[in-house]
Amino acid sequence: SPESVKANIEHYFAPLLLQDKSDNVAQTLKSIHKAINGNRFAKCAVQTALLDIQAQRLGVPLSELLGGRLRDSLPVLWTLASGDTDKDIAEAQKMIAAKRHNTFKLKIGVNPWQQDVEHVIAIKQALGSDISVRVDVNRAWSEMDCIKGIQALQDGGIDLVEQPCAIENTDALRRLTERFDVAIMADEALTGPFSAYRVAKQYGAHVFAVKIAQSGGLLEAKEVATVAKLAGIDLYGGTMLEGPIGTIASAHTFATFANLAFGTDLFGPLL
């Protein structure tokens, strides 16, 4: 929670940082990792601050410390979350008419898979073939439900299915990736470079959702992207619904990715 992250930074990270007199970010981060286990979100917050300070000191954009940006803009999708088919269609059509978004994601998994799939397909049919519609199942389906649900989504023209099964069941994720043409994306299964390597080693997804906080930092998110690149896995820039600071830190990171085939969902500040 934000409260626990704040408490950990105040009680454990701050004393280390106050003792550290170095302006070497890498050395400071090494000391933090040696002293503190886990705490990915807190480590990301501290790393973001350290890199931002260093970038300001050097007078360069933060992305320059991550290798330099390869793009000046990022595509951003919009999430449709009312749960009401007609309302979601109307909201999407409004966004399309305003030329704000042409890619949409729906969070599903609360209802029986048949009901969720019917809802998604109705929206896709209303928006047409030129609009990309994706779903985030949020780990809700069993492997059997995944087989039936993803087949229906694929037949209905859905472009991507995010984390359809349990985090721990990477074998099921691999089997689904092998079985379907629609892109299967790993999200919560990725908690940094090591988990990315485990999933990539068995080609357990077509796409990786990279999130700086979930990865443990901007540098670790870059490492996840490198693992994906070496394994031939596409990338998607994810969000934990950060505010402006986390969003711009993510944007600086994602702008350095050579491959960002599925865009981003950095819409937090737009809410």
Which ranges hold each PLM region?
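Glycine-rich, aromatic-flanked loop segments that form ligand/cofactor-binding clefts
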Residues: 48-80
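Predominant activation on well-ordered alpha-helical scaffold segments within soluble catalytic domains
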Residues: 6, 10-14, 47, 51-52, ...
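Metal-dependent enolase-superfamily TIM-barrel catalytic cores that perform enediolate-based chemistry
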Residues: 67-180
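Conserved, mostly hydrophobic/aromatic
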Residues: 13, 46, 59, 104, ...
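Glycine- and other small-residue-rich loops at beta-strand/loop junctions that grip anionic moieties
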Residues: 43, 81, 108-112, 135-139, ...
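Flexible, glycine/charged-enriched surface loops at secondary-structure junctions
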Residues: 23-25, 62-65, 160-167, 238-240
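Shared catalytic-loop signature of beta/alpha-barrel
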Residues: 157, 168-185, 190-271
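Metal- or metallocofactor-binding catalytic centers and their adjacent structured scaffolds
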Residues: 1-57
